[in-house]
Structures are given as structure tokens and as C-alpha cells.
From Swiss-Prot:
The keyword Cytoplasm applies. Blocks the elongation and depolymerization of the actin filaments at the pointed end. The Tmod/TM complex contributes to the formation of the short actin protofilament, which in turn defines the geometry of the membrane skeleton. It comes from Bos taurus. This is Tropomodulin-4. GO terms for cellular component: cytoskeleton; myofibril; striated muscle thin filament.
Length: 345
């Protein structure tokens, strides 16, 4: 133990209350003065709050800040201004600035052929607008008129150069209809291993109960006909991710899995990635756009899974770190090359 620590040990068990009881009123007042927090740099505070008391005299009266400011302002107005050492005579020195006159440019007289003179004399506003666009005079018209005249082979500017250009009328695009999938019927078909059901698409259905999604994953364990399973934007969390992981360990027919845009955390993604290692039929996996960033450890696990699973040729995730991104790109290139060689055979 150093000497400094030994000195600190002396004051560790000191009772502050006992020390304060032994102090006299004068000593307590001095201690209170030392512990006061002052702000000497704040010019908006009165002097009494910017420094400690320098005297023991009692105040002659209460502090009236407004009266003090009025008194200082009145004193400042009553002080006479100092006379200038050199009186101002009003003499002007130097020459005033006179702007030089600019010469008006003379327009050149251009003589055209009689045929062009006659064509321009009888040209309409729409034709003049197209001619100006072809000659590159884009300052005489709007961008819409200019590009319409350049891109179109016919006269399309019927309004003229100086007219008000109307905006294009766009066709209203209706919203996409809701997902018409009946969850109960899909669950029955998956349980009965219906050979006509090869795709389960529950995208954008956000009111599916978690127990029903868990039952669907449980039914997928023994299904041999479903090739694509998509749960995009279904508000699925870690319980659903764990059920998907259990399904991947037993299912041997699923080829595409999409669980993007959900509430799956890094724990749920890690469980899915570990289960992908035990699945040899999955070729496409998409896990991007979760509620929270999974972390560096999950991204490294993704790169490792892609390196160890040559069956995956499509992977949907936006890496934030350069190392896992480069490893995943190399693994995907290798997996696609292996798939191409297998097709040749």
C-alpha cells in the first residue's frame, strides 16, 4: 500500500457529524461561506451573487434591481459628452463616383433567304417554340416544353413560348389490395400435406396470432410439398423465429424462407442461422430490415453460415461491416458457381 493510500485510510472512518457538532457558530458561518457556489463570470447577476462577502457590515436596505438600473441610466444621461478635439467642418474630400455610361449594343441585321423569311413570318407559336428548342434557346421556354420538343418528332408544344405550362396529369395509382390468404385454410392444407400448396405467403398480414404462426411452423416440419415460406411484415418476434428454427431442423423440402421486416432480435436471428446449418435444401434466405440492428456477432455468424452452407445461393441482408460483407460476397460467388457446375453435369 502506498503512502498516499495510507493517508487516505486515516480519513475513511471520520464521523462528519461529530466534527460539525464541535464547531463554533463563527466557524460554521465561515464553512458555509466557503461552500457557497459563486459564478463570477455571469454579468447578469448582482455583485453579491458573483463574489463572496468582503465585509461584515449589515446591508442598509433591500436590493431593488430596477431602481438601481434606473439610477445608473439617469447618471449616464446626465454626464456631458466630451467635445471633439478637432471639430467637424463638413468639408468633402475626394471625387464622387460617377458610373460610366454603357454603350447600347447595336443589333446586327441578319438577312435570311426569302423562303425562310416567309416561313418565319407565317409560323405559329407552337412552331416557333419547337424551332427555339431545336436551336438550343432553352431560356425562352420551360423544361417541359424544351424536352417535349427535343424528344418528340412532331409539334407538341401547342401553348406557345410565353404561355403558362400546365403540369402533367398522372394517373392515380391505387393501393395494393390486402393479402387474400386465408390463414386457417393454409394451416389445414399444410397439416394435411396438400401437394397443391407449394407456396405459403402471409406477407403484410399483421393480425396473425403468435400461437397460430407457431402451429404453422410446427405443421411445416412434416410437410414435403411447400417450397416457399414467406412471413414478411407479420410483426413476428423471437417466439416465431425459434419456431422457424425448429422447423428448419426437420423440414427437408423448403427452398425459400423470407422473414424480412419483422421484430426479430439478434437472439432469434442467431437461432435461425444455427438451424440453417442443419438444413441442406434451403437455397434462399432473407432476414433484412428487422426492428433493431442485430450486431457484429450476428453478421459474422451470417458470413460463417454462408461459407459452410453451399446450398444457399440467394441471401437477403444489408451488411454494415466490411469484413462480413466481403466474406459473404465471396461465399455467394462460390455457391452460385457450384450450382452452375452441378447443372452442367
Amino acid at each position: 500500500m502506498s503512502s498516499y493510500q495510507k493517508e487516505l485510510e486515516k480519513y475513511r472512518d471520520i464521523d462528519e457529524d461529530e466534527i460539525l457538532k464541535t464547531l463554533s457558530p463563527e466557524e460554521l458561518e465561515q464553512l458555509d461561506c466557503e461552500l457557497q457556489e459563486m459564478d463570477p463570470e455571469n454579468m447578469l447577476l448582482p455583485a453579491g451573487l458573483r463574489q463572496r462577502d468582503q465585509t461584515k457590515k449589515s446591508p442598509t436596505g433591500p436590493l431593488d434591481r430596477e431602481a438601481l438600473l434606473q439610477y445608473l441610466e439617469q447618471q449616464a444621461l446626465e454626464v456631458k459628452e466630451r467635445d471633439d478635439l478637432v471639430p467637424f467642418t463638413g468639408e468633402k474630400k475626394g471625387k464622387p463616383y460617377i458610373q460610366p455610361k454603357r454603350e447600347i449594343p447595336v443589333e446586327e441585321q441578319v438577312t435570311l433567304e426569302p423562303e425562310l423569311e416567309e416561313a418565319l413570318a407565317h409560323a405559329t407559336d407552337a412552331e416557333m417554340c419547337d424551332i427555339a428548342a431545336i436551336l438550343g434557346m432553352y431560356t425562352l421556354m420551360s423544361n417541359k416544353q424544351y424536352y417535349d420538343a427535343i424528344c418528340s418528332g412532331e409539334i407538341c408544344n401547342t401553348e406557345g413560348i410565353s404561355s403558362v405550362v400546365q403540369p402533367d396529369k398522372y394517373k392515380p395509382v391505387p393501393d395494393e389490395p390486402p393479402n387474400p390468404t386465408n390463414i386457417e385454410e393454409i394451416l389445414k392444407s399444410v397439416r394435411s400435406n396438400d401437394k397443391e400448396v407449394e407456396e405459403v405467403n402471409l406477407n403484410n398480414i399483421q393480425d396473425i396470432p403468435i400461437p397460430m404462426l407457431t402451429e404453422l411452423c410446427e405443421a411445416m416440419k412434416t410437410n414435403t410439398h411447400v417450397r416457399s415460406f414467406s412471413l414478411v411484415a407479420t410483426r413476428s418476434g423471437d417466439p416465431v423465429a425459434n419456431a422457424v428454427a425448429d422447423m428448419l431442423r426437420e423440414n427437408r423440402s423448403l427452398q425459400s424462407l423470407n422473414i424480412e421486416s419483422n421484430f426479430i432480435s439478434s437472439t432469434g436471428l442467431m437461432a435461425v442461422l444455427k438451424a440453417v446449418r442443419e438444413n441442406a435444401t434451403l437455397t434462399e434466405l432473407r432476414v433484412d430490415n428487422q426492428r433493431q440492428w442485430p450486431g457484429d456477432a450476428v453478421e459474422m455468424e451470417m458470413a460463417t453460415v454462408l461459407e459452410q452452407c453451399p446450398s444457399i445461393v440467394r441471401f437477403g441482408y444489408h451488411f454494415t461491416q466490411q469484413g462480413p460483407r466481403a466474406r459473404a460476397a465471396q461465399a455467394m460467388t462460390r455457391n452460385n458457381e457450384l450450382r452452375r457446375q452441378q447443372k452442367k453435369r
